């Protein structure tokens, strides 16, 4: 099934969902430290392997982190070639003073916001979906 490309439909249908838990970004030289670990996301950078993990797993492994995030999923099936969705949610959250780290999955966009900002971020995203001015 093809993802949605219409920005108006994407915004109206984004249906943001706050997932349970606290998540952290860690940088590792390689995957060897991640035995028996549920990695939510990863990206290879020049400096090392960035992984997104539940906070409890990072602490159990003794991994350092600087940022504790809440994870919000936009439940609309957005096409990877869709134009404007990232700009729309990043702009709305930025206008509200909320930092956002976005990751596009095959089906959905996933946003990581500071744990303390999760409630406000959900409110901003729900207002954006409803077409309300920020």
What are these regions (language model features)?
Residues 43-46, 118-134:
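Charge-rich, low-aromatic oligomerization/scaffolding segments with amphipathic character
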Residues 1-91, 126:
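Regulatory modules associated with amino-acid/nitrogen control
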Residues 106-108, 117:
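Structural preference for solvent-exposed beta-strand-turn elements
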Residues 92, 96-98, 124-128:
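Generic non-transmembrane alpha-helical segments
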Residues 70-72, 96-98, 109:
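Generic beta-strand structural signal
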Residues 38, 97-102:
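A short linear hydrophobic-aromatic micro-motif
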Residues 55-58, 114-119:
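Helix N-cap motif at beta-to-alpha junctions
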């Amino acid at each position: 099934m093809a993802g949605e490309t219409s920005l108006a439909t994407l915004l109206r249908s984004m249906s943001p969902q706050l997932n349970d838990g606290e998540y952290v970004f860690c940088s590792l030289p390689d995957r060897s430290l991640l035995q028996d670990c549920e990695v939510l996301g990863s990206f290879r950078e020049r400096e090392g392997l960035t992984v997104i993990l539940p906070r409890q797993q990072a602490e159990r492994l003794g991994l350092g982190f600087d940022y504790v995030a809440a994870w919000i999923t936009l439940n609309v099936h957005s096409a990877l070639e869709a134009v404007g969705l990232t700009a729309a949610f990043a702009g709305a959250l930025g206008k509200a003073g909320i930092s956002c780290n976005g990751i596009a999955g095959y089906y959905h966009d996933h946003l990581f916001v500071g744990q303390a900002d999760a409630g406000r971020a959900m409110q901003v995203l729900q207002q954006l979906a409803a077409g309300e001015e920020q």
